[in-house]
Amino acid sequence: MLSPRRTKFRKQQRGRMTGKATRGNTLAFGNFGLQALECSWITARQIEASRRAMTRYTRRGGKIWIRIFPDKPITMRPAETRMGSGKGNPEFWVAVVKPGRVLFEIGGEVAEETAREAMRLASHKLPIKTKFITRDSEAQEA
C-alpha cells in the first residue's frame, strides 16, 4: 500500500475540504481518466483496491497511472481509552481529494469501452461520486 517513506512530522491536523481542485484536474498521461465529483479522504487501501480492480479487468493491457498519493496521517486512540493524555498514534494514510481532481488514468492499447468498464469497477471501491473523462471530452469543455 502507498505511504510516504518519511515525513517531517508524524501527526497532522484534520483540516478542511472546501473548494475545488485547482491542480491535477486535467489528463496528463493517459487518454482516459476518472475524475472526482465530491470531496473526501481516500485511504491507501481504497486506492490499492481500485488499482487491483482496474489491473485485473484490463489484463495488463495498457498502462495505469495513479494521480493521487496518501500523504496525510490519520491518528486514532485505542478503544475505551479515557479522554486526554495526548493525540493517538497514526493508524493509516489518506489522500485529500477535492472535486475536479483526476484520480486515475489509463493509456496505451486500451479501447474506450474497456477503459470505461475498468474505471467503473474502480469507482465502486471509492467513497465518492466520480466521472469518466477522455481527452476528447476535455477538449470540448475547454
Curated annotation (Swiss-Prot):
Keyword Ribosomal protein: yes
GO molecular function: rRNA binding; structural constituent of ribosome; tRNA binding
Keywords, in A-Z order: Ribonucleoprotein, Ribosomal protein, RNA-binding, rRNA-binding, tRNA-binding
Residue ranges, compositional bias (Basic residues): 1-14
The keyword tRNA-binding is assigned to this record: yes
Family matches, as InterPro entries: Ribosomal_uL16, Ribosomal_uL16_bact-type, Ribosomal_uL16_CS, Ribosomal_uL16_dom, Ribosomal_uL16_sf
Gene Ontology BP, a term: translation
Record field: transmembrane: none
GO cellular component terms, semicolon-separated: ribonucleoprotein complex; ribosome
Residue pairs linked by disulfide bridges in the UniProt entry: none
Gene3D superfamilies, per database record: Ribosomal protein L10e/L16
Region annotated Disordered, chain positions: 1-22
Role played: Binds 23S rRNA and is also seen to make contacts with the A and possibly P site tRNAs.
Similarity annotation: Belongs to the universal ribosomal protein uL16 family.
Subunit structure: Part of the 50S ribosomal subunit.
Name the record gives this protein: Large ribosomal subunit protein uL16
